[in-house]
């Protein structure tokens, strides 16, 4: 009988793992968030948000590294939460993670749609705020239709689009540095470092935006079974990729700040285009705008495809609604899961960009990030004999830093975003009680 390989090859070393992680982290984010982060703190001091965000990401990265090496395999957060809380409410924790993901995932995709259309308004200035929302909604509908028609063009050139994005980031940095004005780049407002409520509130908002841009620092944990010496490589890959991406984004911020007054940046909805317009002229600004739109759409298309797989996988494993595990009979993809994520994305596209970003992160914090931090402590307490190839350095200090950091971000996200996240979670608990009762009773469709 032919021997079948039942495990993945561990071929990713530190350099490959770091590059892979950075590849998933670098994206459209800074092109749409630089005005928001500058506005949050009122000047170049917004760089502090990047520094605090990097510290939180590195600390939380150790939580992910320990969980992924002690609970290897597919599933990610919903497996970590299920196992960590299994003595208490593991199934509920896993369900709530998928439930909150049905909100946070579409919000993240919607931020790309809205940001992309805002850049289009540089080419077509007649697009007002209402038009932008309607057009972003229409782009969402168009993307669902593309998925249903199994258009593979965007998926086939994902790597190419990512390279174009890197080139776009690189060109933006290069143009900024070659037109550098120190006075503009470091024009701090009077009394900017006064420890006041305004400073703390602004730092919280800036850190939230920085964390939105750094999301993905944990993606290498999903490839743990393909990493050489994961106990060594995974935590170091997270740290190196966070530092690397933070430096890229910080230099990009400084490059743009050096060419435009920060007050003008804070008001812009297509800041990179405005920078090119001022330094190289409208012709080159339009070319950059088109590059940003193309790469933004490529990334959001891929996100909708990949994010629709998580509810599908959870449903197939029996931890979510059974109907989300249905596969299209002819085109062979999880169409109900895709429709759900797609429709939620279209609705989310009708809101303001700053609210979308705040809600996309705040809705994940309670269950996923804080839940995993507490869950790691519970696993150590309840299963001390479990094999842990990687153990958090200086435990529990990174856990404490990450917990305080995410709590700070959550409280800084604004009452509207907090309210949406909390209400969505409460609704999820009520639906779970009903679903779990039907599921255990064997009712079809549960």
Which stretches of residues belong to each language-model region?
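Membrane-interface "cap" regions at the ends of multi-pass membrane proteins
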Residues: 1-44, 58, 62-65, 190-191, ...
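Helix-loop-helix junctions that connect adjacent transmembrane segments
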Residues: 3-9, 47, 127-131, 160-289
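Membrane-interface loop-to-helix entry segments
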Residues: 117, 131-183, 197, 215, ...
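Hydrophobic alpha-helical segments of multi-pass membrane transport proteins
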Residues: 168-172, 311, 361-388, 424-442
